[in-house]
């Protein structure tokens, strides 16, 4: 489950007097119990959970309420660490570390990290070789770089204060970031002193500052999966290169005797051209010189492509896909057990000495004020009731295990009426009821599908009959008006029959509304002759996407596509980080190398040739445009690298650069191809895994269960509401909480109700699907995890001098990470 980042910000803001004041007991909802010494009253695998108020951190005379507030906050931190998959050895160990932890975990710090990283990356636009329009003087960009690096130093100092030196040096990613920071600092000072730029390949390492940002957690996960998939990938890659070298040697002996064949005249050229042939960029050109001399030579190339391209490359995808599946399952298992351990830590900080059997509502309410500060008092109580499956005054550990799933619910009062028009006069009710029945009928839906299909065919025929040039008519086509009228009538009928809220709650209805609105804007653009907005008319074919709802497989494809969009964005950002690093290296070594007529001595001279010659009275220009694919600045480098990713004619760029530098330049292009092949293979494997997973789940579950979200129904009685209201009044709770509770009470009295039903909703995540897919194995994982915790407890229970705490210190977390 993803972290609600808005709640992280307010964690530090909850340290004021209003929220830290302990609630007084009322009506049995909570009693003033003393927290146990270690945050819990039970002995078990997690009985050694540390507390920020233990040891010398809390004075002997401190009131019990202060201890509870600290326990609430630390329990909330444990839950956040479980949700964010943060290792428990980074847990703040004392009040001083807690202050730094709270500062580091808020949106201000996150934005500071992100903006600093972006500033460092964007400096490549201004540094030599710079984009001409954005070039800055050396002292300006060097000063900006030093400023950004000083901010990074401040960030690392705050993390050092939070983690402590020993934990700080154990954190690998932080140490890598620190090492890069030192190198960047030295280089920036040298540039500022010398007032000139030098070869700075280490600028390619600036991506680490972006990758380490909190908002780029998806990029870190992608990089981790790429590195985890490398061992099997490298095995198949070595096999591929082995066959390539064997065929290169064979090709050299077979075709080097042909003087008209430049592809195999040396062993180096044989290897390079077979590597390019693997991408099919130079096929069949590479075959034609030998094929013209001996037709049987085609067998060599057919066998090579069959083995390398169609067998080993597909085998590579299969191996990566299998490894990716195992990694995804292992990742789900690790995160599930990590969350379970975090819940155990939080639970033992919330049980009291008087009530060691569970968490009272008072303690749960205190936890949620820190864990979900934006959650209202009514929502906190409903969350408690949703968790409390045993209907007892105390929340057991078994019930508390569902805290992540239940805390994400959005609660709303259940409407007493079925439709929005139920309270209208009878005549209006019958009209809207008929419209509701009509728009929900199968006949109406299939009629609209037929209209969309006819519209699609009409657009296709209309476009086919158009000529080149100005294809936008000066008058509005009658077909445009007819179909737009039908779509508009459908929109108004659905809004009238379903109600605006229910209509807009459907993703497909939102899509229909957007396309119809754009079509109406296109009509205005045609009517008012607004040429700059004619592009809106081209969006009409988007209506055809509605036809994908007809077939279940199409719906699954579209649903999978929409589910993949956030992850695909992070994968795209991961690819851009590789682009940035390779672009920096390319600029340092190849900047200014390519120009018109630069490669006349190479085999790709025609692609770079620029010739003016006169034919009669006219000057004719023969221009090869490949000199534009250069590394003269960061923007040109990104375009060039994208062309290399597509692989069509990528060898022309490689050979052009090689002719102006050295043969070793080919290593840069080959390495880039291999790296992008790894990333692209991971992307394909991810898409396959997500689609196959959804297909398997849809076979095991009902279709409605797959498409619908999570819905929980809970009832709140008037007595419970009055008790919570009294509790918050006596505790001087926030005015917004009291106001919402009074609004709910007035609504009950208005309709003379003794209770009110609330619905908790949230979208179904992949974690929910995985819980059902692996439900048989999950119990085995839990049992194995419990045994590991017991063994760890036995190992940690032996007394040793190292286990004795000094005054002012705090016991470290003994959790399995």
UniProtKB/Swiss-Prot annotation:
It comes from Rattus norvegicus (Rat). Signal peptide: none annotated. One of its GO terms (biological process) is sodium ion transmembrane transport. PANTHER family: TWO PORE CALCIUM CHANNEL PROTEIN 1, TWO PORE CHANNEL PROTEIN 1. This is Two pore calcium channel protein 1. It is a multi-pass membrane protein. N-glycosylated. Dimer. Interacts with MTOR; the interaction is required for TPCN1 ATP sensitivity. Interacts with STX7, STX8 and STX12. Interacts with JPT2. Found in a complex with LSM12, TPCN1 and TPCN2. Residues 123-137, 194-202, 257-263, 288-298, 467-480, 528-535, 596-630, 655-671 are extracellular. Na(+) current is inhibited by ATP in a MTORC-dependent manner. ATP sensitivity is independent of PI(3,5)P2. Probably regulated by Mg(2+) ions, cytosolic Mg(2+) selectively inhibits outward current while lysosomal Mg(2+) modestly inhibits both the outward and inward currents. In the absence of Mg(2+), NAADP readily activates TPCN2, with properties similar to PI(3,5)P2. Both current elicited by PI(3,5)P2 as well as NAADP are inhibited by tetrandrine. It catalyses: Na(+)(in) = Na(+)(out); Ca(2+)(in) = Ca(2+)(out). Residues 1-101, 159-172, 222-235, 320-445, 502-504, 551-574, 693-817 are cytoplasmic. Residues 802-817 have a biased composition (Polar residues).
């Amino acid at each position: 489950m993803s972290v609600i980042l808005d709640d992280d910000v307010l964690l530090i803001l909850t340290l004021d007097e209003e929220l830290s004041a302990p609630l007084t007991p009322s009506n049995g909802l909570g009693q003033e119990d003393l927290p146990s010494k270690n945050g819990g009253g039970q002995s078990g695998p997690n009985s050694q959970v540390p507390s920020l108020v233990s040891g010398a951190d809390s004075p002997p005379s401190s009131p019990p309420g202060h201890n509870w507030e600290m326990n609430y906050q630390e329990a909330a931190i444990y839950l956040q660490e479980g949700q964010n998959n943060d290792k428990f050895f980074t847990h703040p160990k004392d009040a001083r570390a807690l202050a730094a932890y709270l500062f580091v975990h808020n949106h201000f710090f996150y934005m500071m990290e992100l903006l600093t990283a972006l500033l460092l990356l964007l400096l490549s636009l201004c540094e030599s070789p710079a984009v001409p329009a954005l070039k800055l003087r050396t002292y300006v960009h060097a000063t900006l770089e030093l400023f950004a690096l000083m901010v990074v130093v401040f960030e690392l100092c705050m993390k050092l204060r939070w983690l402590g030196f020993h934990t700080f040096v154990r954190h690998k990613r932080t140490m890598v970031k620190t090492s890069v920071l030192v190198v960047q600092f030295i280089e920036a000072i040298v540039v500022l002193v010398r007032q000139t730029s030098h070869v700075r390949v280490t600028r390619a390492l600036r991506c680490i500052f972006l990758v380490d940002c909190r908002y780029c957690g998806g990029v870190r996960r992608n990089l981790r999966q790429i590195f985890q998939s490398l061992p099997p990938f490298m095995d198949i890659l070595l096999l591929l290169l082995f066959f390539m070298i064997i065929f290169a040697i064979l090709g050299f002996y077979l075709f080097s005797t042909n003087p008209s064949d430049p592809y195999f005249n040396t062993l180096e050229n044989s290897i390079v051209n077979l590597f390019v042939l693997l991408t099919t960029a130079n096929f069949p050109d590479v075959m034609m010189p030998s094929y013209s001399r001996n037709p049987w030579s085609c067998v060599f190339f057919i066998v090579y492509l069959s083995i390398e391209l169609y067998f080993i490359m597909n085998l590579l995808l299969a191996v990566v896909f299998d490894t990716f599946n195992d990694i995804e399952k292992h990742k789900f298992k690790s995160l599930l057990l990590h969350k379970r351990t975090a819940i155990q830590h939080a639970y033992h900080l919330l049980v009291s000495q008087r009530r060691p059997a569970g968490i009272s509502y008072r303690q749960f309410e205190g936890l949620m004020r820190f864990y979900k500060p934006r959650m209202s008092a009514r929502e906190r109580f409903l969350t408690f009731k949703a968790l409390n499956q045993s209907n007892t005054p105390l929340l057991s550990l078994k019930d508390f295990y569902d805290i992540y799933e239940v805390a994400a619910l959005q609660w709303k009062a259940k409407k007493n009426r079925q439709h929005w028009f139920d309270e209208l006069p009878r005549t209006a009710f019958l009209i809207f009821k008929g419209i509701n029945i009509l728009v929900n009928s199968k006949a109406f839906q299939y009629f609209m599908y037929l209209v969309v299909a006819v519209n699609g065919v009409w657009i296709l025929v209309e476009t086919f009959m158009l000529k080149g040039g100005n294809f936008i008519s000066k008058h509005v086509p009658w077909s445009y008006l007819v179909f737009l009228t039908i779509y508009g009538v459908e929109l108004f009928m659905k809004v009238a029959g379903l109600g605006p809220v229910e209509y807009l709650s459907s993703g497909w209805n939102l899509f229909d509304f957007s396309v119809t609105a754009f079509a109406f804007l296109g009509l205005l653009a045609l009517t008012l002759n607004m040429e700059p907005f004619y592009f809106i008319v081209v969006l009409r074919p988007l209506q055809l996407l509605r036809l994908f709802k007809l077939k279940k497989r199409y719906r699954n494809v579209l649903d999978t596509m929409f589910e993949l969009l956030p992850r695909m964005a992070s994968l795209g950002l991961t690819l851009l980080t590789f682009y940035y690093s390779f672009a920096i290296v390319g600029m340092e070594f190849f900047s200014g190398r390519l120009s018109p007529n630069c490669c006349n001595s190479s085999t790709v001279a025609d692609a770079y040739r620029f010739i003016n010659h006169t034919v009669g009275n006219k000057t004719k220009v023969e221009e090869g445009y490949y000199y534009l694919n250069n590394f003269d600045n960061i923007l040109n480098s990104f375009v060039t690298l994208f062309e290399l990713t597509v692989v069509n004619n990528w060898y022309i760029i490689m050979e052009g650069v090689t002719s102006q530098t050295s043969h070793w330049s080919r290593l840069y292009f080959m390495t880039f191809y291999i790296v992008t092949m790894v990333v692209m293979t991971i992307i394909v494997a991810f898409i396959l895994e997500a689609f196959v997973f959804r297909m398997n789940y849809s076979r095991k579950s009902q279709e409605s269960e797959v498409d619908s979200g999570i819905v929980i129904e809970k009832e709140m009685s008037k007595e419970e509401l009055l008790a919570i209201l009294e509790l918050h009044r006596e505790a001087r709770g926030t005015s917004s909480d009291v106001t919402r509770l009074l609004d709910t009470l007035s609504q009950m009295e208005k309709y003379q109700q003794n209770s009110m039903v609330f619905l908790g909703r949230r979208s179904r995540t992949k974690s929910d699907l995985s819980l059902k897919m692996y439900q048989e194995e999950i119990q085995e994982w839990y049992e194995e995890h419990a045994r590991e915790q017991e063994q760890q407890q036995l190992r940690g229970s032996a007394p040793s001098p190292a286990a004795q705490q000094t005054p002012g210190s705090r016991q470290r977390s003994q959790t399995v990470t």
